C-alpha cells in the first residue's frame, strides 16, 4: 500500500496539531494526492451537547475555513465510545475520517473489555490532544448538599444514583472510590454522553453527576447546583465553588 507523500501528511499534521484536538485516524494512510481533496468526516464517540462534540464542531469549522473543504461531524455514541472508535478503525485509511473522543475511554476500554472490535495499536494513529480542564460536580436542587463532604453524608442515608458519561470514565471511578473509602452505596448510571446525563440531573432522576463545565452550563439555570470542581485550583467560571482537592 502506498503511503502518503510527505508534504500532504505534513499539512494534515500541522492542521490538527495547531488546533490541539484529541484526534485519531485509521493507522495506514494510503492517500497520495494533495490533502484535502474532498469532504472530511469527524466521528465523535459521544452525542451532541457535550465538550467533545463542541471541540469537534469548532475543529471542523477551523478546517473548513483553512482548506475550503466541507467537514461533517458524525456523532456515533454508545458502548463507552466503542461504537465511534470502531467506525473510524474500519474506515478507509485515506485521511478523510477522523475520530474525536476522550483519552480516558480509549485507554480504559482496553481494561474493561476482554474483546474489542478493533486493535488500538494497529488500527488507529493518534494525531493530537486537546487541552483538558476541571470537571464540575453538580446536584439537583432537591439534594441538600452544598459541598462534596455534605453529599457523602447524604449518600450514606439516602439511595443515590450518580451519572457517568461512559463505563470506566472518570465519574465512574469517582463513584467506586467514594463507595470504597466512605462506605456509601452510590449506584453508577451510564449514559451515552454528558448531555443526556445532565438532563436527568436537572429532572431529579440522578442525585449527582460529574462532567465538563460546557455541558453542565446547559442546565445550570434549570435546578442544578455545583458543589465542587476537580483540579488543584478553583475554576474562573465558578469562583465560589470549592475544589475537591
Segments from the language model and where they lie:
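N-terminal secretory signal peptides
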Residues: 1-25
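Short helix-initiation/N-cap motifs at beta->coil->alpha
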Residues: 76-84, 133, 189-199, 214
Amino acid at each position: 500500500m502506498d503511503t502518503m507523500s510527505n508534504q500532504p501528511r505534513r499539512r494534515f499534521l500541522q492542521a490538527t496539531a495547531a488546533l490541539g484536538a484529541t484526534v485519531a485516524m485509521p493507522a495506514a494512510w494510503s492517500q497520495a494526492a494533495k490533502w484535502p481533496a474532498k469532504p472530511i468526516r469527524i466521528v465523535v464517540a459521544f452525542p451532541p451537547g457535550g465538550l467533545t462534540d463542541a471541540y469537534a464542531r469548532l475543529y471542523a469549522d477551523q478546517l473548513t475555513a483553512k482548506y475550503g473543504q466541507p467537514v461533517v461531524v458524525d456523532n456515533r455514541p454508545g458502548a463507552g465510545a466503542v461504537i465511534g472508535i470502531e467506525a473510524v478503525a474500519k474506515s478507509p485509511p485515506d485521511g478523510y475520517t477522523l475520530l474525536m473522543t476522550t483519552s480516558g475511554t480509549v485507554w480504559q476500554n482496553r481494561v474493561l473489555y476482554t474483546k474489542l472490535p478493533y486493535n488500538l495499536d494497529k488500527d488507529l494513529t493518534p494525531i493530537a490532544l486537546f487541552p483538558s480542564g476541571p470537571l464540575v460536580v453538580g446536584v439537583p436542587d432537591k439534594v441538600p448538599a452544598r459541598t462534596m463532604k455534605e453529599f457523602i453524608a447524604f449518600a450514606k442515608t439516602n439511595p443515590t444514583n450518580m451519572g457517568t458519561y461512559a463505563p470506566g470514565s472518570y465519574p465512574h471511578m469517582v463513584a467506586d472510590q467514594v463507595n470504597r473509602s466512605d462506605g456509601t452505596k452510590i449506584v453508577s448510571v451510564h449514559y451515552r454522553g454528558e448531555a443526556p446525563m445532565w438532563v436527568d440531573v436537572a429532572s431529579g432522576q440522578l442525585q449527582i453527576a460529574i462532567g465538563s463545565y460546557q455541558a453542565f452550563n446547559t442546565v445550570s439555570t434549570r435546578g442544578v447546583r455545583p458543589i465542587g470542581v476537580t483540579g488543584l485550583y478553583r475554576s474562573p467560571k465558578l469562583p465560589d465553588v470549592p475544589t475537591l482537592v
